[in-house]
Amino acid sequence: MTSQEEITIEDVPSKQRDGLEWILQESFEGWYLMHSKRTLQHIELVRAAMSSGKPIGLVMLKILEGTIGYVYYVAVAKAQRKNGIGKLLLEDSLRIFKARGAQEVFASVEHDNVASEALFASEGFTPTSFSEVSKKHGNLHTVNMYREMLVVPGEILLRKAMAGD
């Protein structure tokens, strides 16, 4: 077990991201594994939880259209799960989004991924829908957001307001 005091969260430059793929392989399968590996190489920001200089978890983030943040993937090494690493990564992500002026943050999780849904709920994320997002942002803007987020059937879209909303 890793104590949270020993953990640092660091940016991972593009050229060093290959060393994180093993965490994705432990965390995802099928389409999610393929997409997470591709996203890892091209996403604007990857943060890794590090313990004794070794990665034990990661999160992939992107700002969509200036004031909207999106959490693409949170993945934690199997041996480190249930130690609060995912929560540390999500808290760090929210600090980054806030510092960059995000007014709201979205994430999507598989409808049967109870652990991920609980993680996001613990930080104030609530389920939303295309129609709810469209009411605020308009249909075309929402379609473009969904396209960038790659929300697929069988996923629940989650939202958190960051500032007076």
What is each of the regions a protein language model found here?
Residues 133-165:
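C-terminal "cap" of GNAT-fold acetyltransferases
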Residues 97-109:
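Conserved GNAT acetyl-CoA-binding A-motif
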Residues 7, 11-73, 77-78, 90-91:
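Acetyl-CoA-dependent GNAT
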Residues 76, 82-95, 118-122:
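Conserved acetyl-CoA-binding loop-helix of GNAT-fold acetyltransferases
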Residues 66-68, 104, 155:
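A generic structural signal for beta-strand entry/edge sites
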Residues 87, 111-129, 133-140, 144:
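Conserved active-site alpha-helix within GNAT-family acetyltransferase domains
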Residues 1-15, 152, 156-165:
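Conserved N-terminal entry element of GNAT/NAT acetyltransferase domains
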